[in-house]
Each structure stands twice: as structure tokens, then as C-alpha cells.
Amino acid sequence: MEDTLSLAEAMEDLVSAEDFLDYFAVPYDPAVVHVNRLHILQRFHDYLAKQAPNLPPEESQQRGIYRLWLERAYQDFVTSDSLTEKVFAVFQTVSKPDGGMSSFVSLDKVFRQ
């Protein structure tokens, strides 16, 4: 990946969890990534979405923040697992009015952009 690309351009070219980890120079164990790649990327996305309003305008600072959040997302799955972390809505359970539990995900949430 060329260093002349803007952060946004570089992010568009990244495809896999390994691409992101390599680009941001986050050391990783391929065995951890192999099992948790989608969870790591979703957690990274979730962290960035929460941080977005507070990002500094300077791209170099943004790159550093992105790297920290990606490293944290990866570490979440080094020290835990996907069932414990419940990154995706299908793994999250909510209480039902009858006292039971449900992991139902409505279509409006599935197709939300």
C-alpha cells in the first residue's frame, strides 16, 4: 500500500482483517485472526463509530487513533472470544415481556446503513 494515499483512500483498499492489521502495523497471531476476523473488524468499526465525533482534523493523528482502536479490537479477542464479546446483534440477547430471552434481529436493523 502506498504511503501517498490519504487515510480514506487507504481504508478503501483494505479488504481483510490482516490487511488492516498490516497497514496499521499491529502485530497479530494469525490463529487469533483466522477465527475472529469479522468480529475484530466489527469491533474496530464500533470503536471508530463512537470516537468519530471526537477525531482530530489532522490525518496523522487520526491514523494513530485508528491504530490504537484496531489494536484494542484485536486484543479483545486475544483475551476473550466471540461468544463472550457478542459483537454481532445475533449474539446479543434481550429480555422478552414474558420473562424469556430472545436474540431476534429485525430486518430494519439488518439492512440499516
Curated annotation (Swiss-Prot):
Signal peptide: none annotated. Keywords: Nitrogen fixation. It comes from the Bacteria. One of its GO terms (biological process) is nitrogen fixation. It holds the Pfam family NifW. Belongs to the NifW family. Homotrimer; associates with NifD. May protect the nitrogenase Fe-Mo protein from oxidative damage. This is Nitrogenase-stabilizing/protective protein NifW. It comes from Dechloromonas aromatica (strain RCB). The lineage of its organism: Bacteria, Pseudomonadati, Pseudomonadota, Betaproteobacteria, Rhodocyclales.
